[in-house]
């Protein structure tokens, strides 16, 4: 083969299968640079094949429901049950039947940059999106489990068109008779995964805003979870207006500072 390494690199970047004629031709090239390009291309194709297989797996519930006549299938997920501060946020998302997005997964398994990119794509292409936000004070009143259900219901109430079937991550919501709860649903359903991304990015941005309002707890990085910096902030500053007072160790920090007055 007479092409330079740079030309071969460019051509291999467009190859979509190892059966491609140019890929097969490159296999006969004994130059070390070409051998390395073949190896990297093979790894890229293997990764893409895995992503395609994962996407097909994550669309199985939606595909099966569509064949049963359901048209508007909503995925629902939440983020923020465990933090010591801030709201619990739920999202409900109805995707088009032909929606495909390689790399979509549980939001917690994605980098921030990847989540932000997918967030914008989902917002643009979804048929409908609802976001429910239950603040810290309501969490303290009703407990985090009930607050999560309220956030999910609030998100579903916003959907237009209304869903005719609901896929919920982990917890039975009892919002509709046509509903299915899936353990680890954000890794099994593309609709739930989309909802998890919307909820996660929405809440993370809220906590980054709160970090500027209430410095000293590192909210921009821990998102309200009980990290060492957050706990140090509680010990030295005390509680702030968005802390969940019913959660330990927030409750203890509040009592400690009250005892010093």
UniProtKB/Swiss-Prot annotation:
One of its GO terms (molecular function) is RNA binding. Manganese or magnesium. Binds 1 divalent metal ion per monomer in the absence of substrate. May bind a second metal ion after substrate binding. The keyword Ribonucleoprotein does not apply. A divalent metal cation binds at residues 77-78, 169. Keywords: Cytoplasm, Endonuclease, Hydrolase, Manganese, Metal-binding, Nuclease. Transmembrane segments: none annotated. GO terms for cellular component: cytoplasm; ribonuclease H2 complex. Coiled coil: none annotated. Its EC number is 3.1.26.4. The keyword Protein biosynthesis does not apply. Its main location: cytoplasm. Its cofactor is Mn(2+); Mg(2+). Residues 71-259 form the RNase H type-2 domain. Signal peptide: none annotated. NCBIfam families: PRK00015.1-1, PRK00015.1-3. This is Ribonuclease HII. It comes from Listeria welshimeri serovar 6b (strain ATCC 35897 / DSM 20650 / CCUG 15529 / CIP 8149 / NCTC 11857 / SLCC 5334 / V8). The lineage of its organism: Bacteria, Bacillati, Bacillota, Bacilli, Bacillales.
């Amino acid at each position: 083969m007479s092409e330079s390494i740079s030309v071969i690199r460019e051509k291999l970047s467009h190859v979509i299968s190892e059966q491609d004629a140019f890929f097969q031709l490159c296999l006969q090239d004994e130059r070390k640079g070409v051998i390395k390009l073949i190896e990297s291309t093979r790894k890229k194709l293997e990764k893409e094949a895995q992503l395609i297989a994962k996407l097909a797996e994550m669309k199985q519930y939606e595909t099966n429901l569509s064949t049963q006549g359901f048209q508007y299938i909503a995925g629902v997920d939440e983020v923020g049950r465990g933090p010591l501060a801030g709201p619990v946020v739920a999202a409900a998302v109805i995707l088009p039947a032909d929606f495909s997005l390689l790399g979509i997964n549980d939001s917690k398994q994605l980098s921030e940059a990847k989540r932000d990119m997918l967030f914008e794509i989902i917002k643009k292409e979804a048929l409908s999106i609802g976001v429910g936000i239950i603040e810290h004070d309501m969490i303290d009143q009703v407990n985090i489990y009930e607050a999560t259900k309220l956030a999910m219901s609030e998100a579903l109430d916003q959907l237009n068109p209304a869903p005719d079937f609901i896929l919920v991550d982990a917890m039975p919501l009892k919002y509709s008779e046509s509903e299915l709860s899936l353990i680890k649903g954000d890794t099994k359903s593309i609709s739930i995964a989309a909802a998890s991304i919307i909820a996660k990015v929405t809440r993370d941005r809220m906590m980054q805003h709160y970090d500027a309002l209430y410095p000293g707890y590192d909210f921009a990085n821990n998102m309200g979870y009980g990290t060492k910096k957050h706990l140090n902030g509680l010990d030295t500053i005390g509680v702030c207006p968005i802390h969940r007072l019913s959660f330990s160790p927030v409750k203890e920090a509040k009592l400690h500072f009250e005892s010093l007055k």
